[in-house]
Amino acid sequence: AVIAVESARKHASVPVAATLTFMKNPRGFFTIMGDDPALTIRKLEAAGADIVGANCTIASAEMVELARALRGMTELPILCQPNAGQPRLSAGRPVYDQTPEDFALDALELFSIGVNAVGGCCGTTPRFIEEIAARMTQH
């Protein structure tokens, strides 16, 4: 991710967002390569990222927990793109059980703790984003 940010900085004059995939273990969150999030965020900042965040692997409720930690690690805008729950196989295909309504509630929580942008990753559909937008207009 650091090399990608540095390259984008060199070759384009647009804002650069870098999101990473995290997993949770008993010691907390780490990238899928085992890297500490605070160190990784500092490296992305030093490389010139304008926006940092997390995507994929974890469901929206876990993303809220991770985002709280990330908010304490950086002043940069944060982008979060959680999965629609954890997948399970049904007839050989992944199925995500989280509803757009539950996902949107977690998205509102993400915004309330200082996340600047929320999207969706695996298992989400346009309906998930529509539900977030609908709930945002109610607040």
For the regions a protein language model found, what residue spans apply to each?
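Domain-level signal for soluble alpha/beta catalytic cores
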Residues: 1-139
